[in-house]
Amino acid sequence: KANANTALLKILAQEGAGADVVSAGELYLALKAGFSPDRITFAGVGKREDEIEYALKNDIFSINAESSQELQVISLVALRLGKKARISLRVNPDIDAQSHPYITTGLKQNKFGIPAEEALKLFQYAGSLSHLEVIGVHAHIGSQITKVEPFVEAAAFLAGLVKSLREAGLPINHIDFGGGFGVQYINALACEGLPKEPEGGAVPPLQLFVEGALPVLKETGCSLWFEPGRSIVANAGILLTRVLYTKENGAKKFVVVDAGMNDL
């Protein structure tokens, strides 16, 4: 999601990175760039049946499911293909990432994941479907998170969830911790009238984010996957956009540009 540049993807694949995809198109790019299928996860709330089939045919590591209906579809596709689908369930921990509300994904009001209070029931349901192999738990609480505390809270939540699931007889051995690690953007071009971003200090280094979450996660003995995404490529380029219009709606002034949230 953070980078679709095939030249950069090839370098990341050669360096041993994995890939998190949210569409068949992204999965195609990842495979074309040389990512090993056993290092690819498929996330997203709206996976089509044909996309699920494409993922299963390529034997990727895990499909991260987000609802009971999706579990049914994955199971039916796997049955049709004569396969057993490896899945993780994304759980919504209701944790405030303390980032921009448009890119917060771990609160109850967000569409992502299954509610924490329903997790055990849905994990048991997934385990009852003969063509699913439940291997892990997944969470992702937001993007551009600049504080360590939400990650510490998320790690404690996931470790507790794994413990509860194991006590219920579910052999969970994998945690996908998600990402959202904030980055300090570097302003390559200064513009009069716009504030210059400080050179450092506002965002902790990536190491501190990981160190905050790692101790409690390691105690589970699970394989651990992180999604550093934006933090890898954020300062590898600049976004050049043009002001199209300015407008006022009541007390607010808006500047309309030819770029969107997806470009950020």
PLM ranges: what are they?
Residues 143-264:
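C-terminal active-site-proximal or functional interface alpha/beta core segments in diverse enzymes
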Residues 2-174, 183, 244, 256:
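Active-site-proximal beta-alpha core segment in soluble small-molecule metabolic enzymes
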